[in-house]
From Swiss-Prot:
Record protein name field: DNA-directed RNA polymerase III subunit RPC1
Function, in words: DNA-dependent RNA polymerase catalyzes the transcription of DNA into RNA using the four ribonucleoside triphosphates as substrates. Largest and catalytic core component of RNA polymerase III which synthesizes small RNAs, such as 5S rRNA and tRNAs. Forms the polymerase active center together with the second largest subunit. A single-stranded DNA template strand of the promoter is positioned within the central active site cleft of Pol III.
GO CC, any one term: plastid
Lineage summary: Eukaryota, Metamonada, Diplomonadida, Hexamitidae, Giardiinae
Disulfide pattern: none
Alphabetized GO MF terms: DNA binding; DNA-directed RNA polymerase activity; metal ion binding
Binding-site list for Mg(2+): 722, 724, 726
Region ranges (Disordered): 1719-1741
GO biological process per UniProt: DNA-templated transcription
């Protein structure tokens, strides 16, 4: 094929983008404004005047709300405005002119504010010139906070600073008017009081009514006032000021009909309304020229726009009419009903104004009814809660049917249709397990695969294969449709009219075909390239070259600038004068006179067959137009016919074999074949709810004959899926770019490690763990036959078990395709042709292989496989202080060297979610593909081994032995005795209360702890006494299911049931159940169950167990909604954050939120160690040493070992090289150095003497740590490589990942607060409620706790006991100082004393209690009296000082208090009030700190001599008042913490608040065992505080975080409020965020959208010129390998028969000719070879 005919490859002399943007025009920003009446009239197509829907059904009434000029709502007919059908016409707006103006329903509060700050006489904002200097910043920077401050100051003005008129304040009034209150408001109030006092004087009532009526501001007056506001006052009204120097000559259209108002005035029936209307008309006619002129920008908000004089009528397609089933009529949309009511009441209002005979009150009532109907149309409700007036004919007025109601909420347009959309090419069905599939594969039912298609573009390399698919048709594998694009272009006579002759000019047609084929979008043919410059240039070039056939040249730049590049109407000479037939703006240069008599139209219509060409009258003309979707369109200019030559999409479902053969023969490159979903195609697999990014991942398809989606159960964890009826979704991507990105970014093997905590999210589960655990046991041996059989289970060489036997039904090419993938980087199956079989572990008396050897073969794979696993770690049951290691009796210490499993049983710790996992090691060192391969092998072998070995659970497995029952009795008896002892102490009063708790609370907490320990002890018995073959014990030990507690509940005892963290409450008439006595504290009466599931439960035990289960079910049901809303708020606030190329975290406005992600910029996925070091240096060094030693032994080399000094010197030399110093920072170098000095070098000192006496190779086997120069070099290289990859990549959406990392585990947290054992019996709010408090930024939290650290001087020589005693003494003292003490706590008595002379209250202090509290000398009578006199509430009763005589001190322990008043009527009431108030008066401590509890904790003390942890004490203070606590002497303020975030921010600053948020979220997660990386939590804290104050993730905080993102705020909550505020403030949305990009359909600026990918040109090395891109010599396409020779032959045939119809051959003929050519070529090559062979024969000597 010639170079200019290769249409697939993009060529250019300069670097070009790899992907050509199909939509070069994008929405860059959105400007919001309130549409004025003038702009609305310009946009309107028709004036709606009649409320009648149909003149003659089904013909809509002219000028009605269903007028056809508004567009179409059904599929029949054409639009009367644009002439298009329903698919192409987007609808047109109309208008309704109101008889009287109304307030805008969404802006009525803003109108009220404007009228309050604008003087009604001079229309100036009531802010003086001097005060305006303070707000001068509004002229160049608009600030809503400054605007509100200025408005508040304007409302306080008594007189207008410009005209000195009295000031007014507008408030709500009845109906839709505004009540203006002036300075005579007090007089009106007095008149009203006089009226009531004189039994409703009629004259005064009328006078009052007249006074109040004169000051009611209706929309007419408001419009008059706001129209005269100068532009310099706009910023104070909340409207940004803009330069308005260019004015139009038009007058303002925002006025009422003056004729109607004049007629109303002449009739004189409504005096008030007439006077108002006439005054408005007179003043309106006298408005200055400046106020009547409009700006050139029609979409700038003005103050008078808050008053409506015209309302828009939406297009008919937005409010379609539904035909009734019987055909008798239609059911109209709610918007249509609202519009009809508005027109009806509008006509009635006009009649009332014209006639003049209607009373004024009725006119006002109709006016209010018009306001109500307009409000229902806009916002679906009536402001102020006013009920609408229902007519007799109305069936009822429904709320929630307005325009705003269609936008807001979950079912609104923003959330239901714009942010999330329903898609095609998707499927959904039930899921089922298949352990023989790779973790990258999902089995798709054949029925689904036949319905899902992919648009495959035909090329010279896949044409043969696609022809075979076309021949199959609907038979799988086949195709459903074919788009013969080339025939549409080649044989279209319209191209001939442009001078493109098929037989004469092939080059020009090739250009046209290349041009249009680039524009066609393969997955949506209705969306073509918009205004491509090269398309316009190509059309100009084609037209200019064919000037003989066309008289004029079309130039895109000659079109008017404001005219769209698309003429929507059909130009008809017979109807040239009608505006409804042609756009008046069509330029004459668009008309191209053609000489031919038959005209055609080339358009686009996907999914329909081509229409025939219709011959037209010779007098018709054709207009060539460029439409907005950049297709080549020839519009027929005849009024009689309108024919279109559409894209030829042919369906194969109804074609027979002959028809499909014809279509296959006509297939050419650039055609599109919609083929079936084939094996190995890329899919997206999803399960809802999608709580994190791993809920939707990329899989490869495998086709099977079943009806479910099948996949490997190891991938269940990220989906949180099980196989009890769950359904999942698939999405079949339709673009090559999307498939490529999904494979790299969303592949399931790429998501083995979760970004939430950096641990494995995908691993072996349940039966797989059980099978591997049993197989790796010490007692598993097998013969060579069994050994090879198990190896073959995992090392599947042919893929039969993986892909299914039914795959052979699809032909050998698919099998060949699968085989060709083996060994490639994308091969996640990991076929093994030649496994690495090892020698038997037992040779005599019989050769036997162990199960560990089978696992070793699975880990090794092929001989050429470079995967070497080196792990050494203890299991969870291995004691950390043990030194037995490989000699552990329980076989729970794992050693794997060079992929040889030597010691230990594999459990969940090494096969699932852990950083000690085998798969985690593989991902970090060898990549995710190797981990996926080995995971599949383990899953296959575990499933087959378990089937052969047998693993069942029966009743005998949970049957306790007599020994176990005996030990149970002993443990239960001991627990009962301890409980009874505590109960007796409680009943006798000997039980002491824990500080901060009552005696009863202390008893319940103690008993709960004692009885819970009983079950724990029984669980330990189960682990020790059960046989090692016990099935529940095996499942518990390997981690597949269950725990020791579950085993104890099945076999031994259920134990204490928990109800919200405590025992069962006595909420059934002072007892838990009717089976027990009232107030019983016995264990069984409080939910302790002595029986097990094996023995069965007693009735009261069954009730307790069911009650505890119900408590958990309710908690789970309630937390679902709370956590779902919590995650939605988190995602909305964090979705815009991403990592920039300077490694800062920025939002969509490019504001810096963090200078480094998580303060260090590291990716949690690549961090191997949680804290301190970034990598597991021990494992890395051991791995390198083992690899080098095995390599040395294989090569026969002798390593030179280093002693300590040589190793240290070598390390210093290597670290100082530039190779390591450029990338590795000083912190990492110091970690490596300290690691060597502490862990490696001491061992070298003690072991290197062996190397002097033994051969080095033998010494290497004995030494515990061997080290060579190569080892150190390789180790540093690996550290450097890992460190370079450690940073989070630029473009990463770190915000969304952080939100999901916190939101997803919150679904597993509890809703209730519980007793925290480590916090000294204080009930701390935890779980979801605490998390909501933190992220919401709540000011008043439920349990504010301040952790007060004490400052104690400790000498180095002091003993631990002395240090502990000092801390305890200091804690008691500080507790008494800080904790608030009330008068009632230290009073012996508070007595009322009545005598003839005086009545008072006598208070006696209990000095013993004061001394016991340690407050002797701090609390005295004088301090108590001073506290009473300084109390705000007591001041009103006893005065402010002692001189008043209300307080008298009688002794050191007694004083009296009496009220100031001596009135008989008030004295008794004041005495009782004072008696209730006195006990609650604080007399010592901090009043806001209700209590302080001493907390004990362990810590290493540097000042003490002992190295053991010391017992220390601190205070937990409940309440607020951090600043007051820090002022107390003796407090260590550097370590004192508070969980009240807002208080910390106000006291210590915003950075302290950031640290507090991070610590609190971390503590909340850790208390529930939820692992979340600290970097995500820090990002949450920074986004809450990066504005300088704490902003919660609420609708209010989000508004302050992203005030300019109108679309995002509207899609979250309060849709109408945000849209109205944005329109009034002329806000500009830059539309750079994620939500805005999704709604507007443009790429977001993160991920792959954060950069542009360029393709460099190819240069000839000799000439230096650019050359065409050449594909690879061999191309794999679903198993069909095409060599270069075949490509050249196909290209030769295509070149010879591509354009010439006479030489066109069918597929069979072309194949025959190809075979003949091959035979001739073989003959020629054979003859040449024979001649050459003859020439090479040796001559005779």
């Amino acid at each position: 094929m010639e170079p200019n005919r290769r249409l697939r490859y993009f060529r250019s002399e300069i670097p070009q983008p790899v992907t050509e943007h199909r939509f070069p025009k994008r929405v860059e920003k959105l400007v919001f404004s309130v549409l004025s009446s003038n702009a609305l009239m310009k946009l309107s197509e028709v004036q709606i005047t009649t409320p009648i829907l149909y003149e003659h059904y089904p013909s809509p009434a002219t000028n009605g709300v269903l007028d056809k000029r508004l567009g179409l709502s059904d599929k029949v007919g054409k639009c009367a405005t644009c002439g298009k059908d329903t698919k192409m016409c987007i609808g047109h707006f109309g208008t309704i002119s109101l008889a009287l103006p109304v307030f805008h329903p969404g802006l009525i509060n803003d109108a009220r504010t404007m009228l309050s700050i604008v003087c009604p006489f001079c229309s100036r904002v009531k802010i003086s010139e001097a005060d305006r200097l303070k707000y001068k910043v509004l002229n160049h920077k608009f600030s809503l906070a400054i605007v509100k401050e200025a408005q508040e100051q304007a409302k306080k003005q008594v007189n207008c600073p410009f005209c000195h008129a009295p000031s007014t304040i507008c408030k709500k009034s009845q109906g839709f008017r505004v009540l203006r209150e002036m300075h005579y408001e007090e007089r009106a109030t007095k008149i009203l009081a006089d009226v009531i006092k004189h039994q409703k004087d009629i004259e005064k009532i009328q006078e009052l009514d007249q006074r109040l009526r004169n000051h009611v501001v209706d929309p007419i007056q408001a419009l008059h006032i706001l129209q005269k506001v100068p532009e310099c006052d706009y910023p104070y009204l909340g409207i940004p000021w803009q330069s308005r120097n260019v004015y139009a000559s038009q007058q303002t259209p925002d006025s009422i009909a003056s004729n109607d108002a004049s007629q109303l005035f002449s009739r004189g029936s409504s005096k008030l309304l007439a006077r108002t209307a006439s005054r408005f008309i007179a003043q309106h006619q006298g408005i200055s020229d400046r106020a009547t002129r409009l700006t050139s920008h029609a979409f700038l908000t003005r103050p008078q726009d808050v008053i409506l004089t015209h309302i828009p009528v939406p297009p008919s397609c937005l409010r379609p009419s539904v035909q009734s089933g019987s055909g008798a009529g239609t059911t109209e949309d709610n918007l249509t009903s609202h519009l009809v009511r508005i027109l009806t009441i509008n006509d009635k209002l006009k009649e009332a104004m014209v006639s003049g005979a209607v009373a004024t009150s009725k006119v006002y009532a109709k006016w209010d009814q018009l306001n109500m109907d307009v409000s229902l149309l806009y916002i679906g409700k009536i402001p102020g809660g006013v009920q609408p007036v229902k007519n007799k004919t109305d069936s009822g007025t429904k709320e929630g049917t307005g325009i705003i109601d269609r936008l807001k909420g979950k079912a609104g347009r923003f959330r239901s249709n714009l942010s999330g959309k329903r898609v095609n090419f998707s499927g959904r069905t039930v899921i089922s397990p298949n352990p023989y599939l790779s973790m990258q594969q999902v089995a798709i039912p054949r029925l689904i695969a036949q319905n899902l298609t992919f648009p495959e573009i035909v090329t010279s390399r896949n044409i043969r294969f696609l022809r075979e698919l076309i021949l199959n048709g609907k038979t799988y594998p086949g195709a459903n449709e074919v788009l013969l694009l080339n025939d549409t272009i080649r044989y279209n006579p319209a191209l001939k009219r442009l001078g493109i002759d098929v037989k004469q000019s092939r080059d020009m047609e090739a250009k046209a075909m290349e041009l249009v084929s680039r524009c066609v979008d393969t997955f949506n043919l209705n969306s073509l390239c918009a205004d491509l410059p090269e398309l316009q240039a190509a059309i100009q070039h084609l037209v200019s070259e064919s000037s003989n056939a066309i008289n004029s040249e079309l130039k895109a730049e000659d079109l008017p600038q404001n005219q769209p590049l698309f003429a929507k109407e059909v130009y008809d000479p017979a109807q040239k004068g009608e505006s409804n037939n042609i756009d008046n703006n069509v330029c004459e240069i668009d008309e191209l006179k053609l000489e031919d008599t038959a005209d055609y139209q080339v358009g686009e219509s996907a999914g329909q067959a081509s229409t025939v060409a219709v011959e037209q009258p010779p007098e018709s003309r054709t207009v060539l137009k460029l439409n907005s979707i950049a297709s080549l369109q020839l519009t027929n200019a005849s009024s009689q016919h309108l024919s279109t030559f559409k894209l030829n999409t042919v369906s194969l479902l109804q074609k027979d074999r002959r028809g499909r053969q014809a279509i296959a023969n006509s297939l050419r490159p650039n055609d599109i074949v919609y083929r079936h979903l084939l094996p190995n195609d890329t899919l997206l697999f999803n399960r809802q709810p999608s709580l994190h990014r791993m809920s939707i991942m990329q899989f490869n398809a495998v086709i099977h004959e079943n009806r479910t989606f099948s996949f490997n159960p190891v991938v269940c964890s990220p989906f949180n899926a099980d196989f009890d009826g769950d359904e999942m979704n698939i999405f079949y991507m339709q673009g090559q770019e999307a498939r490529a990105e999904a494979g790299i970014l969303m592949g399931s093997h790429e998501n083995i490690i979760s970004p939430r905590h950096g641990e494995c999210m995908i691993g072996l589960t349940q039966d797989f763990l059980t099978g591997i655990y049993l197989l790796s046991g010490k007692g598993i041996f097998m013969t060579r036959q069994e050994y090879c059989q198990h190896v073959s289970y995992g090392c599947d060489g042919f893929g039969d078990a993986t892909y299914g036997v039914s795959l052979y039904n699809y032909g050998r090419e698919f099998i060949k395709s699968i085989h060709d993938r083996r060994g490639t980087e994308e091969d996640t199956v990991g076929f093994v042709k030649v496994p690495c079989l090892s020698q038997p572990c037992i040779v005599y008396p019989r050769q036997l292989y162990s199960g560990k050897q089978v696992l070793s073969v699975l880990m090794k794979g092929n001989d050429f496989d470079s995967v070497n696993i080196n792990l050494e770690h203890g299991d969870k049951t291995y004691k950390k202080d043990s030194d037995r290691r490989a000699l552990s009796v329980n076989d729970d210490y794992i050693i794997i060297q060079n992929s040889e499993h030597l010691v230990g049983r594999l459990t969940k710790t090494f096969l699932a979610s852990s950083k000690n996992c085998i798969f985690y090691f593989l991902v970090q060192n060898y990549g995710p593909v190797s981990a996926a391969r080995i995971m599949l092998r383990f899953a296959k072998v575990a499933a087959r081994f378990l089937m052969n070995y047998g693993f069942t659970i029966g009743i005998d497995d949970v049957m306790p032995s007599q020994r176990v029952l005996g030990k149970k009795e002993v443990i239960v008896q001991e627990g009962y005795e301890k409980a009874q002892e505590k109960i007796r102490d409680y009943e006798s009063g000997k039980l002491e209360a824990i500080p901060g708790s009552t005696v009863q609370e202390t008893l319940e907490a103690t008993l709960n702890q004692i009885l819970s320990n009983v079950r724990e002890s029984c669980a330990q018995i189960a682990l020790k006494e059960l046989h090692f073959t016990n099935k529940p014990l095996i499942m518990s030990l390997c981690g597949s299911k269950g725990s020791p507690i579950n085993i104890a509940q099945m076999i031994i005892i259920l134990g204490q049931q928990s109800f919200g963290g405590s025992r069962a409450p006595d909420d059934f008439y002072t007892r838990s159940t009717p089976y027990f006595y009232h107030y019983s504290k016995e264990p069984n009466a409080k939910g302790f169950i002595l029986n097990s599931f094996y023995t069965g439960l007693l009735p009261f035990e069954f009730l307790a167990h069911a009650r505890a289960g119900r408590d958990g079910v309710i908690d789970s049901a309630c937390k679902t909604a709370d956590t779902g809303y919590l995650q939605r708020r988190l995602v909305k606030c964090l979705e815009d954050l991403s990592v920039s190329y300077d490694f800062t975290v920025r939002n969509s406005k490019k504001s810096v939120v963090q200078f480094r992600f998580g303060h260090d910029g590291f990716d949690p996925i690549k961090l191997e160690v949680g804290t301190g070091q970034c990598f597991d240096l021990d494992t890395l060094l051991r791995h390198i040493i083992l690899l080098n030693r095995s390599q040395d032994l294989a090569e026969g080399a002798f390593p030179v070992l280093l002693d300590r000094y040589k190793a240290e010197a070598e390390l210093d030399v290597l670290l100082n090289k530039d190779f390591y110093g450029q990338e590795a920072c000083l912190i990492e170098r110091s970690n490596v150095t300290s690691y060597f000095q502490q862990s490696i070098l001491p061992k070298l000192t003690t072991n290197t003497h062996i190397a002097t006496t033994v051969a080095p190779a033998l010494a290497a086997s004995f030494l515990q740590t061997t080290l060579t120069k190569k080892d150190i070099d390789d180790f540093l290289r690996q550290v450097r490589r890992k460190y370079i990859r450690l940073n989070l990549e630029p473009g990463s959406p770190c915000g969304a990942v952080a939100a999901q990392s916190v939101g997803e585990p919150s679904t597993q947290m509890t809703l209730k607060s519980f007793h925290h054992a480590g916090l000294a019996s204080m009930n701390i709010t935890q779980g979801v409620p605490r998390l909501k408090e933190i992220v919401d930024g709540v000011v008043k939290i439920s349990t504010p706790i301040t952790t007060v650290e004490l400052h104690v001087d400790v000498d180095k020589e002091e003993l631990a006991a002395t240090v502990t005693e000092k801390y305890l003494e200091k804690a008691r003292m500080m507790k008494n100082i800080i904790e608030c003490t009330y008068l009632g706590q230290i009073s012996a008595s508070i007595i009322e004393c009545y005598s003839q002379s005086v009545c008072h209250i006598e208070v006696n202090l209990d000095m013993k209690i004061i001394a016991d509290m340690g407050l002797a000398g701090i609390i005295t009578v004088e301090t108590v009296v001073a506290s009473i006199l300084h109390n705000d509430k007591a001041k009103k009763l006893v005065g402010q000082d002692q001189s008043s005589g209300s307080v008298s001190i009688h002794s050191a322990t007694r004083f009296s208090v009496r009220p100031l008043t001596q009135s008989r009527d008030d004295l008794l009431f004041d005495i009782q009030s004072l008696k209730l108030l006195l006990p609650m008066i604080p007399v010592s401590g901090i009043s806001t700190c209700s209590r302080a509890v001493i907390n004990e904790y362990k810590e290493f003390c540097q000042g003490a001599t002992s190295s053991a942890p010391l017992t220390k004490y601190n205070l937990l203070v409940e309440g607020i008042g951090l600043q007051n606590i820090l002022n107390v002497s003796g407090i260590d303020f550097t370590r004192t913490l508070s969980n009240n975030i807002v208080e910390v921010a106000n006291t210590l600053g915003i950075e302290a608040a950031v640290a507090t948020i991070s610590n609190e979220i971390k503590a909340c997660m850790d208390s529930h065992g939820m692992a979340v990386d600290m970097r995500h939590i820090r990002l949450l804290a920074d986004i809450m505080c990066f504005r300088g104050r704490v902003l919660g993730f609420t609708r209010f905080g989000l508004t302050k975080m992203k005030a300019d993102s109108v679309i995002m705020l509207a899609s979250f909550e309060k849709t109408g409020e945000h849209l109205f505020n944005a329109a009034l403030g002329n806000k500009v949305d830059e539309a750079n965020g994620v939500t805005e990009s999704i709604i507007l359909g443009k790429p977001m600026s993160m991920g792959t959208g954060s950069f542009s990918l360029l393709q460099a040109p190819y240069f000839d090395e000799k000439t230096g010129k650019t050359i065409e891109y050449q594909p690879k010599q061999t191309t794999r396409f679903l198993g069909e390998v095409l060599n270069k020779q075949y490509d050249e032959e196909v290209d030769a045939i295509v070149n010879a028969f591509w354009y010439d119809e006479k030489l066109y051959l069918t597929g069979a003929e072309a194949k025959a000719k190809l075979l003949r050519g091959r035979r001739h070529a073989n003959k020629r090559s054979w003859s040449r070879g024979k001649e050459r062979h003859a020439s090479l024969k040796p001559k005779n000597r």
